[in-house]
């Protein structure tokens, strides 16, 4: 059912994928239209493409408000593994998306534990302070 949407999100046309991600994100804040897509987004968390990982993580977070079946309960541990991604942009974008998730789901303990386990030493000196700042900002909301 969502095969075409997944193709666009994961396709080689990154501009189209990014625009489509923004469109799905906006729509996800207004309706549960893409909630059923959660199960299909999950495997994308392991994509080789960093942007695909970010898009899937973020869209899954945006479904938290509609998670009447508690689908995210079975995915949250794998989602939080992205907070230790090798790409600092993935870590930063995932931390950003967690703000939305934590409004609707009580994963505070798991999220805080994952934030505390981020190894900032593996990132360049230019990125580590930015990630630390993101971590501190999210912790203030927990």
Kindly give the residue locations of the regions a language model identified.
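N-terminal "cap/leader" segments of large eukaryotic alpha-helical scaffolds
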Residues: 1-25
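Eukaryotic acidic, Ser/Thr-rich intrinsically disordered low-complexity regions
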Residues: 2, 112-142
């Amino acid at each position: 059912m969502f095969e075409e949407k997944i193709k666009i999100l994961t396709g080689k046309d990154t501009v189209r994928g990014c625009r489509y991600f923004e469109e799905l994100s906006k729509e996800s804040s207004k309706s549960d239209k893409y909630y059923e897509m959660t199960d299909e987004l999950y495997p994308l968390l392991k994509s080789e493409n960093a942007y695909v990982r970010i898009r899937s993580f973020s869209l899954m977070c945006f479904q938290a408000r509609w998670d009447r079946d508690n689908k995210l309960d079975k995915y949250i541990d794998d989602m939080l593994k992205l907070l230790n991604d090798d790409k600092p942009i993935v870590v930063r974008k995932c931390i950003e998306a967690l703000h939305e998730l934590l409004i609707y789901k009580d994963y505070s303990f798991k999220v805080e534990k994952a934030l505390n386990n981020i190894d900032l030493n593996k990132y360049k000196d230019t990125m580590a302070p930015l990630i630390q700042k993101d971590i501190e900002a999210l912790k203030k909301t927990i």
